[in-house]
Curated annotation (Swiss-Prot):
Phylogenetic classification of the source organism: Eukaryota, Metazoa, Chordata, Craniata, Vertebrata
Biological source species: Homo sapiens (Human)
Phosphothreonine PTM positions: T219
Subunit structure: Interacts with a spindle orientation complex at least composed of GNAI1, GPSM2 and NUMA1. Interacts with GPSM2 (via TPR motifs); this interaction is required to prevent GPSM2 anchoring at the mitotic apical cortex and is inhibited in presence of NUMA1 in a dose dependent manner. Interacts with PARD3.
A Pfam family matched in the record: Suppressor_APC
Modified residues (Phosphoserine): S284
Gene that encodes it: SAPCD2
Main location: cytoplasm
Gene Ontology cellular-component annotations: apical cortex; apical junction complex; apical plasma membrane; bicellular tight junction; cytosol; nucleolus; nucleoplasm
Name the record gives this protein: Suppressor APC domain-containing protein 2
Length: 394
């Protein structure tokens, strides 16, 4: 006997069983998985206890049920990181302690004439394959399978409904046997209290049942929508692009004004000194030079951008944006008018240059004729003075 006692003392105690999610309905586990994924924003597979406490102990978490954080602290390991199984086990522990706590010892005993209290009610979970998952309280005799939630389940009291309107898709799991549907009432009550805790965190009013195929929007306790955050980010990017374009347009406007002043000054100087060889020569430099094709390309791109913006804005009839500038087919754009005016000015300058050259050629022809006439007259006078023997051949 002493040897057996020593053997019992030296035996290592068996390790504590790992937390499991057995005994909870699939739809409830899916809801908890969604909540755990929101808390695990870094996708590490575990969440530290301090992160949960910092999120659930703020000013917006005043309606948090008592014992939730204590239950999570009980199941948390030494490192403080909670996996999904430990997270579910902590919620189950806290909800069981809140639902099945010690009774009031000062309660009076039942009198002989009083009716006996009604039998305890159990939670019946509809399978996750139904369009809506409903929790209803009804007596469940042993050995009888839980009936499916029918149309009458939607007419029950609000306290008996605690499930999303549509079962979210979940990863493939092995089918449970029929005996898994009959669990102890403690785990069923834990599922109901956990549902009420999740509804208290959300703080939203109950909505109408969603249509099949409509996407659910998962929000944190603060009520910030992920889709709204995405839209705000896209609008911020569009704002940055528009501000950059506006800055480039302002700089381009200054450059256009400088070039326009240079062209006007050059026109004025050419008008004052028409006979100057410096400005009237064919090889005189142009104000823009090689930049002229690029300037025309920029003007064309801006015209296409405005035309596309006006076309897209004219499609919706109820557009509240500012009216776009009128771009009619009868009047050409401004950049085309500027190009036409520039070509006309160049044509005028070339015509003027050709006229001046023609006048100069005519003047030189006249001078040549006068010189030839003077030469013939001089030869005639020399022949008369020199006699018949002197002859000059031209």
């Amino acid at each position: 006997m002493a040897g057996a006692a020593m053997a019992e003392r030296g035996r290592v105690p068996p390790p504590a069983p790992a937390p499991s999610t057995e005994g909870l309905p699939r739809a409830f586990l899916q809801s908890l998985r969604t909540l755990f994924d929101i808390l695990d924003d870094r996708r590490r597979g575990c969440v530290h206890l301090r992160e949960i406490e910092s999120r659930w102990q703020g000013t917006d978490a005043r309606e948090l049920p008592r014992g939730v954080l204590e239950g999570l602290r009980q199941v948390a390991p030494a490192s403080g990181y909670l996996t999904f199984e430990r997270f579910v086990a902590g919620l189950r522990t806290s909800l069981l302690s809140a639902d099945g706590g010690p009774r009031d010892p000062t309660r009076a005993p039942a009198r002989p004439g009083d009716q006996p209290p009604p039998p305890p009610q159990r939670l019946v979970f509809a399978p996750a394959d139904e369009p809506r998952t409903v929790l209803e309280r009804k007596p469940l005799p042993l050995g009888v399978r839980a009936p499916l939630a029918g149309p009458s389940a939607a007419a029950r009291s609000p306290e008996q409904l605690c499930a999303p309107a549509e079962a979210a898709p979940c990863p493939a799991e092995p089918e449970r046997s029929q005996s898994a549907a009959l669990e102890p009432s403690s785990s069923a009550d834990a599922g109901a209290v956990a549902c009420r805790a999740l509804e208290a965190d959300s703080g939203d009013a109950r909505r109408a049942p969603r249509a099949r195929g409509e996407r659910r929007r998962h929000t944190i306790a603060s009520g910030v929508d992920c889709g709204l955050l995405k839209q705000m980010k896209e609008l911020e990017q569009e704002k940055e692009v528009l501000l950059q374009g506006l800055e480039m347009m302002a700089r381009g406007r200054d450059w256009y004004q400088q070039q326009l002043q240079r062209v006007q000054e050059r026109q004025r100087r050419l008008g004052q000194s028409r006979a100057s060889a410096d400005f009237g020569a064919a090889g005189s430099p142009r104000p823009l030079g090689r930049l002229l094709p690029k300037v025309q390309e920029v003007a064309r791109c801006l015209g296409e951008l405005l035309a596309a913006a006006c076309a897209s804005r004219a499609l919706p009839p109820s557009s509240s944006g500012p009216p776009c500038p009128a771009l009619t087919s009868t009047s050409p754009p401004v950049w085309q008018q500027q190009t036409i005016l520039m070509l006309k000015e160049q044509n005028r300058l070339l015509t003027q240059e050709v006229t001046e050259k023609s006048e100069r050629i005519t003047q030189l022809e006249q001078e040549k004729s006068a010189l030839i006439k003077q030469l013939f007259e001089a030869r005639a006078l020399s022949q008369q003075d020199g006699g018949p023997l002197d002859s000059t051949f031209i």
